[in-house]
Amino acid sequence: MTNLKLDVLTAEGKTDGQVELPAEIFDREASVALLHQVVNAQLAAKRQGTHSAKTRAEVSGGGRKPFRQKGTGRARQGSIRAPHFTGGGISHGPKPRDYSQRTPKKMIKAALFGALTDRARHERIHVISELVAGQTPSTKSARSFIERITDRRNVLLVVGREDVTAQKSARNLPGVHILFADQLNTYDVLYSDDVVFSVEALNTFINRASGAAQEEK
């Protein structure tokens, strides 16, 4: 495993040095089964699970027998709220439940590193010094800069929490999703075609992730 070097791009389209992507984070073996499991767990945890259908016992009405048991020529019925009646209860319907799955932290980290490795190997990770020049937010400038970096549809922009200029500049851009370094996750990396880090956010992420990588060893 070798560290990958990337150019740091400026808002003016120039190069401002290089950064190293540590091999223990950006050059890992990616397990498709692990990625699938972690993404499924992540999406499941987003579900509210508040769905609820009423059974025949919970539907209002239906307390009396609709007609006598014998002599009518019809099939016997005990309640108009049985599941086969219009307006009746639901049989085997959904009830409130917790969809979250327990996923070990090591698996979550390994999946994230695997997803970032895939993006790095396909040259879909980019590093910028700043999204727009100066301290004035500009959606037009941000859009132009991102389009120069990549022509793909979905872009994940990882910036520092203090970088308000970048956040305001990119928050209304279609296809651009903004995250902070401590929010980076497997699903958003895989959903995005390209990942664009600011230098500040990349350093923050590497410092956090390097500790996790050392713990795995």
From Swiss-Prot:
Pfam families: Ribosomal_L4 (PF00573). The keyword Methyltransferase does not apply. Disulfide bonds: none annotated. It comes from the Bacteria. Residues 46-102 are annotated as: Disordered. Signal peptide: none annotated. The keyword Ribonucleoprotein applies. One of its GO terms (molecular function) is structural constituent of ribosome. Transmembrane segments: none annotated. Keywords: Ribonucleoprotein, Ribosomal protein, RNA-binding, rRNA-binding. One of its GO terms (cellular component) is ribonucleoprotein complex. GO terms for biological process: translation. HAMAP family: Ribosomal_uL4_B. Part of the 50S ribosomal subunit. Belongs to the universal ribosomal protein uL4 family. One of the primary rRNA binding proteins, this protein initially binds near the 5'-end of the 23S rRNA. It is important during the early stages of 50S assembly. It makes multiple contacts with different domains of the 23S rRNA in the assembled 50S subunit and ribosome. Forms part of the polypeptide exit tunnel. This is Large ribosomal subunit protein uL4. It comes from Corynebacterium diphtheriae (strain ATCC 700971 / NCTC 13129 / Biotype gravis).
